[in-house]
């Protein structure tokens, strides 16, 4: 095998590969053995017709397609390795010369993994943010628990007040026309919950059972349905019932009823601890995002379009899987949100580009710093995935994953380790 490389454009090369005549003839023989059972020739049992007879009857060309595929399978990867080329897509192959007893000459035009000029990544002037938990945040959580455990009582008389649950029928109109999804019957709306748009809920305060009212609101600009975004709307509302919440006392008995704690003080302390953990996770995410932004901005990389397309494809598949888990199809989701496939892919483009660039740059840093994934990390990650995908026998699933996807698992860990290395060096 002989290969020559020509750079066509950024991240695209053309390889001219020559396969020795003996090797191509061997590929022709393999192609004959693969296909000889397809031919019926008088005087010969099926599959026993000599190659010379088939060549004479049909021409050697009948074996070219399979022989070329066999020869390319054997020579293309060898050429990539010899020339240290890392493709990111399938090649476009063109045959230059072909014939029995001759060299097979073909070209393979392929998009390659981009070269990276790594920017600053050591000693970055980036600090992990810190978020304190306020007493107000703790009290808000306690109040939400109190509200969820309230006793609901029907109000036989009186009017709707803030915090009440109004049982309503409603029908919405935009430009004088009823719109899809804008109608409801016996809907329980908690006043002050912010469930409905604009100041819809506030306009119901003071109404009594049996009252009717035209409620005027404006849809948000980013409501999610193009035909409703930023549109003024009118809702015909009928009040059919009013319910009030009787809140439980916030004391030790309340804490015992809603949690595993014996006192309200212990409950609040636990809430504070959980909020602190949540804040720390948030701070870590923001710190990580700031580091990634910095290394992307200072590095130089020309991203091949095919890598971006593949990442968007992956993000779309991930979205589709999550929707299916919720009982929705992608088409239903697009109809509900007023999106098209093109709009969704365009929306994902920026995040996809950021992720691919970050992975490529971090991989380059890992190579420069000789960052590895330890056997312990590989086994732990495989077991985590095993618990997720094979809960009945996680160890067995972990072993399967290590055999089938070790490279992917290892790559993820190396990128995580590299990011950790960069974060630890921040000033």
UniProtKB/Swiss-Prot annotation:
Domain PPIase FKBP-type span(s) in chain numbering: 163-248
Gene3D superfamilies attached to this UniProt entry: 3.10.50.40, Trigger factor ribosome-binding domain, Trigger factor, C-terminal domain
Record GO biological process: 'de novo' cotranslational protein folding; cell division; chaperone-mediated protein folding; protein transport; protein unfolding
EC number(s) recorded for this UniProt protein: 5.2.1.8
Subcellular location: Cytoplasm
InterPro entries: PPIase_dom_sf, PPIase_FKBP_dom, Trig_fac, Trigger_fac_C, Trigger_fac_C_sf, Trigger_fac_ribosome-bd_bac, Trigger_fac_ribosome-bd_sf, Trigger_fact/SurA_dom_sf
GO molecular function annotation: peptidyl-prolyl cis-trans isomerase activity; protein folding chaperone; ribosome binding
Protein name, as recorded: Trigger factor
Gene name of the record: tig
């Amino acid at each position: 095998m002989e290969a020559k490389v020509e750079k066509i454009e950024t991240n695209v090369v053309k390889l001219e590969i020559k396969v020795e005549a003996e090797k191509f003839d061997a590929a022709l023989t393999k192609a004959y053995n693969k296909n000889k059972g397809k031919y019926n020739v008088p005087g010969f049992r099926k599959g026993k017709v000599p190659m010379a007879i088939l060549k004479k009857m049909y021409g050697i060309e009948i074996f070219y397609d399979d022989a070329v595929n066999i020869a390319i399978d054997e020579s293309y990867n060898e050429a990539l390795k010899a020339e240290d080329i890392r493709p990111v897509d399938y090649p476009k192959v063109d045959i230059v010369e072909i014939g029995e007893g001759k060299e097979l000459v073909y070209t393979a035009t392929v998009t390659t993994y981009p070269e990276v000029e790594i920017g600053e990544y050591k000693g970055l002037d980036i600090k992990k943010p810190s978020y304190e938990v306020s007493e107000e945040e703790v009290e808000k959580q306690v109040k939400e628990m109190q509200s969820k455990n309230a006793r609901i009582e029907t109000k036989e008389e009186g009017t709707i007040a803030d915090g009440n649950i109004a049982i309503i029928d409603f029908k919405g109109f935009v430009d004088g026309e009823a719109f899809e999804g804008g109608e409801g019957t016996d809907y329980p709306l908690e006043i002050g919950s912010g469930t409905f748009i604009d100041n819809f809920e506030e306009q119901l305060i003071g109404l009594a059972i049996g009252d009717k009212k035209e409620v005027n609101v404006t849809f948000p600009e980013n409501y999610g349905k193009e035909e409703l975004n930023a549109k003024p709307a009118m809702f015909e509302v009928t009040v059919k019932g009013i319910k009030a919440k009787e809140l439980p006392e916030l004391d030790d008995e309340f804490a015992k009823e809603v949690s595993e704690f014996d006192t309200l003080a212990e409950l609040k302390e636990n809430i504070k601890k959980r909020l602190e953990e949540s804040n720390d996770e948030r701070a870590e995410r923001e710190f990580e995002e700031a580091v990634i932004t910095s290394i992307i901005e200072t590095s130089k990389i020309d991203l091949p379009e095919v890598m971006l397309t593949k990442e968007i494809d992956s993000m779309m598949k991930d979205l589709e899987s999550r929707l299916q888990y919720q009982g929705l199809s992608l088409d239903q989701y697009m109809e509900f949100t007023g999106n098209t496939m093109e709009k969704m892919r365009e929306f994902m483009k920026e995040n996809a580009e950021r992720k691919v660039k970050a992975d490529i740059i971090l991989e380059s840093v890992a190579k420069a710093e000789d960052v590895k994934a330890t056997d312990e990390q590989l086994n732990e990650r495989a077991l985590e995935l095993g618990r997720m995908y094979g809960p009945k026998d996680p160890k067995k699933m972990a072993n399967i994953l290590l055999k089938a996807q070790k490279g992917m698992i290892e790559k993820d860990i190396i990128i995580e380790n590299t990011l950790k290395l960069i974060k630890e060096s921040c000033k």
